[in-house]
A protein has these predicted regions:
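Intrinsically disordered, low-complexity domain-flanking/linker segments in eukaryotic proteins
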Residues: 59-80, 171, 326-327, 418, ...
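Hydrophobic transmembrane alpha-helical segments that form the core helix bundle
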Residues: 156-322, 422
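Topogenic membrane-insertion module of multi-pass membrane proteins
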Residues: 1-92
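Transit-peptide-like, low-complexity N-terminal presequences
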Residues: 1-29, 371-438
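Acidic (Asp/Glu-rich) catalytic motifs at the cytosolic membrane interface
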Residues: 97-116, 137-151, 295-298, 336-347
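C-terminal, well-structured subdomains that either form a transmembrane helix-short loop-helix hairpin
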Residues: 329-363
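Post-HEXXH active-site segment of zinc metalloproteases
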Residues: 61, 113-129, 157-161, 354-359
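Membrane-embedded alpha-helical segments that form the functional core of polytopic membrane enzymes
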Residues: 66-67, 71-103, 121-135, 322, ...
Length: 438
């Protein structure tokens, strides 16, 4: 169901079993192809090198006046040409860095090679190259897959409740009450959105911002004793920290050798979003925050409390989006185009997910969530409409700054589904996937 269709339809939880989902997907789509996986690794590294070579060639391109095809007769033309070439480099290299993140994400799910150590070693280096702690993120991300859309247990983008904003009870709250707390100028909204896109990743890594609030203050992804991790994961956390220190050292010595400006231009600007061009350059970290936020933050998608949550319901509470069109498929490895399939089959290689999506759409039917909205507008829409949820209710939707939810639960149909669900003990589906979800 597309966004507009969901808006006009009361919500009914999917009356679907895990067996129905699994039976719809041919087993060959779940198999790894090491040669094909190797191709994608080589391809992404090659594109990174190609874009880096392009960056090194910018001044030569200007001196040659674009190979003689575009004479530059004035100083302003040279400056404009230089600015456009650098922006092109930052955009494409940013996509390349984002492809490293998405490949490491697949390695974290053990989807590309049969050998666990091969997956972990390659994922470790791909993530370290873009200053991401592989084993730490792998641990919290796999926990997210086991508990997706659970208000009590999910790891990421857990909605704020009414009490967080100190709003009056809904029975006596007025529109003015909501606007006093939640309304803001467009400039302030864009400023907060820009902050989330630029530094949201590091806020999550260092302070657990936008993460589960069941963890104590000081929770982060760098301490092996963080509440996020089990004792057997601590060695991996230390190794992740060593990888970050190693990459940081490489960048430090590169700045000593080639200058800080060179490291900024060739590495850090593709790594983060920068000010005035943020609308056109959601690179690396901005892309990562954008795609992960939009997977699970939408006014028409539910969150569940424990009495109504099941693993199947949580996995279905995600959204497929055509983020960046062909560029998203090529560089981001289907992570947004086929995110629903990824949550149902996180152990399947990304290159088979388009086919898996086709298979499960026939089972999910109206419970398959898709949004054809331009992803940049969808980001703004979710950021401004997904404000808070109520403290009560087993199935809840985000409310906007007016205290209104985009959808309501079809209570009459929910009772019928609940009787069938409890009879089949649907909540046990969580247990089946807690193993395969890695």
């Amino acid at each position: 169901m597309d966004f507009d269709f969901r808006l006009g339809k009361p919500f009914v939880p999917p009356p679907i079993t895990l067996k129905q989902i699994h039976d719809a997907v041919p087993k060959h789509l779940l198999r790894k192809d090491p040669w094909r996986s190797t191709y994608f690794c080589i391809r992404d590294v090659s594109f990174c090198g190609l874009f880096f070579y392009f960056g090194l060639s910018i001044e030569r391109i200007l001196r040659s006046e674009f190979g003689g095809y575009l004479p530059l007769t004035a100083a302003w033309q040279v400056k404009l040409g230089r600015a456009l070439l650098w922006m092109a480099y930052w955009w494409w290299q940013g996509l390349s860095f984002a492809s490293f993140f998405c490949l490491a994400h697949e390695f974290g799910h053990q989807t590309l090679y049969h050998n666990k150590y091969v997956n972990d070693i390659l994922g470790y280096f791909f993530h370290a190259a873009i200053l991401a702690p592989f084993f730490a993120w792998k641990a919290s991300h796999n926990a997210h897959h086991r508990t997706v859309a659970s208000i009590e247990r999910d790891e990421n983008y857990v909605p704020y409740e009414r009490s967080y904003y100190q709003l009056p009870p809904k029975e006596r709250a007025t529109t003015a009450d909501y606007l006093e707390v939640l309304d803001e100028t467009p400039i302030l909204t864009m400023g907060r959105l820009l902050i989330m896109q630029c530094v949201g990743w590091w806020l999550y890594m260092t302070t657990n911002a936008m993460g589960s609030r069941r963890y104590p203050k000081g929770t982060n992804h760098f301490s092996p004793y963080s509440s996020l991790f089990r004792p057997e994961e601590r060695l991996g956390i230390v190794l992740s920290d060593i990888g970050l220190i190693g990459m940081g050292s490489i960048l430090y010595y590169a700045s000593k050798l080639y200058g800080g400006k060179a490291v900024l231009m060739y590495y850090f600007i593709p790594y983060v979003v920068r000010g005035v061009f943020f609308w056109a350059r959601y690179v690396t970290i901005g892309l990562v925050l954008m795609l992960t936020y939009l997977h699970h933050s939408d006014p028409t998608i539910p969150h569940y409390r424990k009495e109504q949550w099941s693993w199947v319901r949580g996995a279905a509470a995600t959204v497929d989006r055509p983020l960046l069109g062909w560029m998203g498929r090529f560089f981001l490895h289907n992570v947004s185009h086929d995110h629903v399939a990824h949550h149902f089959f996180s152990y399947a290689p990304f290159y088979n997910q388009p086919e898996i999506t086709k298979c499960i759409r026939g089972v999910l039917k109206d419970h398959y969530n898709y949004d054809s909205t331009n992803s940049f507008y969808a980001l703004y829409r979710s950021f401004t409409q997904c404000m808070f949820i109520e403290e009560e209710g087993a199935i809840v939707f985000y409310k906007n700054k007016h205290g209104q939810a985009a959808r309501e639960v079809a209570e009459d149909q929910l009772k019928i589904i609940d009787e069938r669900w409890k009879a089949e003990d649907g909540r046990l589906q969580c247990c089946h996937e807690s193993v395969s979800g890695f």
